[in-house]
Amino acid sequence: MGDNIIFHRILFTLFAIFDCFLFYRLAQIVTKKINGTDFLYLSRISLLVYVFFRNLSQFTSSANNTENFGLTFLLLMVLSYLGYLNNKKSFYLITSGFCFSVLFFLKGNFALFSLPIILNIIITNFKTIKKVIWQLFLYGLPLVLHALAWLLYFYKNNAVNDFITASFIFSSKYMKSAWAGHVSPQGVFVIVLLSFVLPFFLYSLTLIKNLKKNREPELTILSYFSIISFIFIIMLGSFYPYYLLITFPFMILGFIYFWENSKPKMFKVGVLVLLFSSIFAWSTSMKQFYNFFGGPVATEAKENKAVSEYVESVTSKNDKIIAYTYGATFYELTGRNSGSRFISASVLLLDEREKYGFGFSDIYIKDMEASKPKFVIYPAGNDSLYFQNKKLVEYFENHYFENKTFKDYIILKRTPN
């Protein structure tokens, strides 16, 4: 894809349209079990709610994240498994397992979403151990083959330890830091849980309470996924709205079950709460919309462009640079490669500040010593979060000098040897 932003936008839009289509297919299957007479009406209501929340800016977050891609494979995983339950063809179970394998390597904690299927396999076949083993084998086979392929690839590149660290160990330490309140404000996380997630949890309680009564496997599995969704949210421990996106299909279908099975008074309360949550979520999204076109985000974009144009003017395409900030924005805007394997300062800060012990800052310095990037895009002022990484701040102060100043950034130039 390279740096073709238009192609990226088209790709992300196609993914969004496709997962909305997949959700509608799942909604039709589930609502038919909730109310066989009005299932088309219910499935359309669920699609309307899904499309509304799924495309709010705070949840879609530019669409370039694992949650947006994960939705497609999560929905395919569930649909494939339901297909297997209906016709018992092994192909569907293997396909479901393949989708889970993709989910797992997109983000390790997505592994939780395999538990409803594993649990259902065990419970429905517990009297026949051979069936349990065979079905678990078919479901897990793609993951094993996928893992072996990755291990072989990284083994050939002498990077197995890096692969395991980046894919699993760092994420587990990050989760611990998140729950300690060191990643994002816990207060904001709790407010969002209370205002948005909690209402959907209460809707799903009706479904979960009727777990034993529901004899339809589709509703049983939906109950399992609802429980896992809330466990997943609680385990996050940090507030980034797009983290919640992966749970939307089950929260919304839980609401539809509530819609059909609640008593009249509870139904009215539930709808009012949904309206409140919708207005709150929409208002948040509109604030981001304003910020993008006329607020701080628009101002930041102008500065980023000015900084990038300057760096581009004083470097050649083959020159390496360092952007000591979050993400890869400046590498993309300048068309210059990073002088280190690390492109975001956030990972370096977490490792150094939280004492993870990976030595990322030392590796970062070694990379810069080898590539000797001519320029560094550096935060202006001393209040930047990334000034907490004293080791890197000291390195920049000893090896670079101020070249040009912008409002939020300083361009540093490497001191001649």
Listing of model-derived features with the role each one plays in the protein:
Residues 115, 297-354, 358, 364-386:
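Short periplasmic/luminal acceptor-recognition loop of GT-C membrane glycosyltransferases, typified by
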Residues 59-69, 240-241:
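Short acidic/glycine- and proline-prone juxtamembrane loop motifs at membrane-interface regions
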Residues 236-267:
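Hydrophobic/aromatic-rich transmembrane helices and adjacent perimembrane loops
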Residues 83-101, 130-138, 217-227:
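Short hydrophobic alpha-helices at membrane interfaces in multi-pass membrane enzymes
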Residues 28-31, 35-37, 75-95, 195-216, ...:
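Membrane-interface transmembrane helices that cradle and orient dolichyl/undecaprenyl
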Residues 69-86, 92, 99-100, 121, ...:
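Specific aromatic-rich, kink-prone transmembrane helix
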Residues 91-108, 114-119, 145, 226-235:
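Membrane-interface alpha helices of multi-pass inner-membrane proteins
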Residues 10-36, 51-52, 76:
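Transmembrane-helix motifs of polytopic, lipid-linked glycan transferases
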